[in-house]
Regions:
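Conserved beta-strand hairpin/beta-sheet module of binuclear metal-dependent hydrolase folds
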Residues: 2-62, 151-154, 158-162, 257
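Structural motif
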Residues: 42-44, 72, 134, 158-161, ...
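Metallo-beta-lactamase
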Residues: 2-5, 100-149, 195-201
Length: 386
């Protein structure tokens, strides 16, 4: 695929994968592993692909090279889905040099038993790789989302090679009916979201560049309305809500708490609120995390289980904390048969999160819904709708 006259796409699509990084469901739309070629007087290849697709990738590269020989392999990120082809590339093209950060070369020793000492070129912030007619200026992007990561900027065609930044779930040969944001959001908050301050740092560097195209390592090449993508990443990485709305995440066993959640959702919608509801035992938890970060309010609803909260709720709260959940209003709904304690437990688990505001009101369901707990639902719906 031609991105510009001299920059080509040679990535691959994976339709066999079911779980990305062993946990994120991509069974419906697959995954893309992106790689690029910059054709100057010298030729640079940007990143490789996952181990199962190295032969296909090398075939794509040969087609674009059209008899020429690459001079450089630029490694922006060492995660195996982007670095598995390094050794095969270096063997096939013995005159090529490998360009990466010092941190990436240290990782190469761990993965390949060598850092290709006779052929390596270590780059850092501000270094320039001159290809003749094109050049790559390197931008340090540590912890977006691994410590060795670098971005690069090609100044002739004004292209940012952004490693895992601006990536999304889904293969590139399938059109996503939901557009970019939904699966990009799930990808960001699942994989990159913990490292918001590092994303903020690299966005500040990118603000000084004239960027016309963004080439990430997953998902589509971004060529239009780039301000939208940059602004969205700024919102996500600063942990600000993207939209007004309420996510309800619940864990119910016999249906009594589920009934309370359904009544609360209906009461909120009747008050004009946008509501998304997740059964944590059955729904995709990554989507629940995504919406918890997307909206400005969150309801946590759990049964009391062995004096604690239900395991999937504990996992959900832990995942939010692990990804630096903050700047939100949170309400609690609990249930129990004789001594409800879930709200107390959830309150304690939320204590370590930054700028979390608990609502004044909560809902307690003792056994099943009754007039008292229904009244609490109405009061909480009023507070959440202010």
């Amino acid at each position: 695929m031609e991105i510009t006259k001299d920059i080509r796409y040679i990535g691959v699509n994976d339709h066999d994968i079911d779980l990305f990084e062993g946990q994120y469901d991509v069974s419906e739309n697959g995954m893309a592993y992106n790689s690029y070629v910059i054709l100057g007087d010298k030729i640079a290849v940007a990143d490789s692909v996952d181990a199962g697709f190295v032969d296909e990738w090398l075939g794509n590269l040969e087609t674009v090279l059209d008899g020429r020989t690459p001079d450089y392999l630029v490694v922006h990120h060492m995660e195996p889905d982007h670095s598995a082809g390094i050794a095969a590339f270096m063997e096939r093209y013995p005159q090529a040099q490998i360009v990466a950060s010092m941190g990436a070369f240290r990782m190469m020793v761990n993965y390949f038993g060598t850092d290709f000492p006779e052929r390596k070129m270590v780059v850092k912030e501000g270094d320039v790789l001159d290809l003749g007619g094109h050049s790559l200026t390197f931008i340090g992007a540590p912890n977006v989302h691994w410590p060795e990561v670098i971005f690069s900027y090609e100044s002739t065609d004004k292209v940012l090679f952004s490693a895992d930044g601006f990536g999304k779930f889904g293969a590139n040969d399938i059109e996503d009916p939901e557009g970019w944001a939904c699966e990009a959001r799930r990808y960001y908050f699942g994989i990159v979201g913990k490292f918001g301050k590092f994303v903020q740092a690299v966005l500040k560097k990118a603000a000084d560049l004239d960027i016309q195209i963004i080439c990430p390592l997953h998902g589509p090449v971004l060529t239009e309305n780039l301000g939208y993508y940059l602004d969205t990443y700024n919102t996500w990485s600063s942990y600000q809500p993207e939209d007004e709305g309420i996510t309800i995440a619940y864990a119910s066993v016999y249906g009594h708490l589920k009934a309370a959640v359904e009544e609360l959702a209906s009461a909120l919608e009747a008050r004009g609120q946008k509501v998304s509801v997740f059964d944590l035992a059955r729904d995709d938890m990554a989507e629940a995390v995504e919406d918890a970060f997307r909206y400005d309010r969150l309801v946590l609803a759990s049964i009391t289980y062995q004096g604690e909260i239900f395991p999937c709720m504990s996992t959900f709260i832990h995942t939010l904390a692990e990804h630096a959940y903050q700047n939100r209003t949170v309400a609690l709904v609990e249930s129990g048969s004789w001594a409800p304690a879930a709200a107390k437990v959830m309150t304690k688990e939320l204590e370590g999160m930054k700028d979390i505001t608990l609502t004044q009101n909560k809902v307690t369901v003792l056994g099943s819904l009754n007039d008292a707990s229904r009244a609490q639902i109405e009061v909480l719906a009023d507070e959440l709708s202010k």
